[in-house]
Amino acid sequence: MLILISPAKTLDYQSPLTTTRYTLPELLDNSQQLIHEARKLTPPQISTLMRISDKLAGINAARFHDWQPDFTPENARQAILAFKGDVYTGLQAETFSEDDFDFTQQHLRMLSGLYGVLRPLDLMQPYRLEMGIRLENARGKDLYQFWGDIITNKLNEALAAQGDNVVINLASDEYFKSVKPKKLNAEIIKPVFLDEKNGKFKIISFYAKKARGLMSRFIIENRLTKPEQLTGFNSEGYFFDEASSSNGELVFKRYEQR
């Protein structure tokens, strides 16, 4: 089983590391090409392209400038410990044991606009480059055209290495769009998380993102290997709703706290 999650905008390069083990990203030649393109942008252009403040644009221009192809524990940290968004709040990788990291390294991948595909222990230098950004490059008008089949091929390699053919899609639509489902050698299972609000169940972004992290942690902690085992997920009040689920989509609901 291969879990896919999105990266996060919020990064943490200060907290103590809970493991010293690391690997290197496998698509750095591609990353370097994108850095070359990104370095052409001025901070005002970055601000417009990414729809971020002038201050954040300045920070990210500096990150593009400071990025270097030689990754070390001094200038980078493990991706799963560097990302700190809602998904990662649910995942809580900072509490993982070494055995958890072993399982995660084999069974979880983070999709990334700059790095393509990251394994949990891959070193990552700080960046912000969301997959949906229209950054023109030598291969096309945006990052989807830049990555083409590369991300899908890398995921197929990971599936072949573990001798499995199931992908658990816990990534956002923006990021999963970088994967070519018809070329992916896998059955795709998508968990969906609905929260009750005023008597109706719907996707509430903050809760859904955290739930994706909680589901990832549930799979890792319990060393799950079969998609039907996911229906046992019950973290923080969620329950499986078989009636609302269909082939390829597992629906989990949570009642409003009263």
From Swiss-Prot:
Say which domain of life the source belongs to: Bacteria
Q: Which Pfam families match?
A: H2O2_YaaD
| A GO term from the CC aspect | cytosol
List, in alphabetical order, the GO biological process terms annotated in this UniProt record. response to hydroperoxide
InterPro entries per UniProt: YaaA
Family membership noted in the UniProt record: Belongs to the UPF0246 family.
- Protein name, please? UPF0246 protein YaaA
